[in-house]
Amino acid sequence: MTTYQPDAETVATQTLSSDELLQEATGVNYVEVIQTVISSMAQEDSAMVSQTEVGHLWKFKYGSVEVFVQLTGSTDDDTLTVWSSVLGLPAKDEPQLMRKLLEMNGAETFEARFAIVNDRVVVISSRTVAELSPGEISRTITIVATIADNNDELLQQQFGQ
């Protein structure tokens, strides 16, 4: 009688999580990279993380803003999204606010942009995980956090209710 003995390497691969498989294939562990970037930027031990069925969500304080980082998964079609709220709506002189935000989007926001989400003006950047490098992760988080921190107080002073 012959018994089937599965190849040990195949069995080991089958027990790896999708994050581990991605790291093995690309050499990048996105969760670890994000946590490293956040730990270097977060103030006063403010970083928090939660893991749900839709991925990982981090929150940390940077200057005067809270920054959120969401990683939906580890496949090429999953996304890394970073955002920070800078102003609640409605605002004073909204036409002038919209003009200012559009002008800043064109000249000052690099890969990020100002947007309106749930009646809040946010600085946001989002991209797929496909070919995402540790440097891009760091740059994206840094750009969003810095632009939000540099502009929130000015926008609130000028346009806040």
Give the label of every model feature segment:
Residues 1-66:
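Charge-rich, low-complexity N-terminal segments
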Residues 26-33, 89, 93-97, 136-143, ...:
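Short amphipathic alpha-helical segments
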Residues 38, 98-102, 141:
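A generic alpha-helix structural signal
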Residues 49-51, 71-73, 112-115:
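Short, exposed beta-strand/loop patches in secreted or surface proteins that constitute
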Residues 60-95:
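The feature represents the first ordered module of a protein
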Residues 81-120, 124:
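Short, internal acidic amphipathic alpha-helical interface segments
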Residues 109-142, 146-161:
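Well-ordered alpha/beta subsegment
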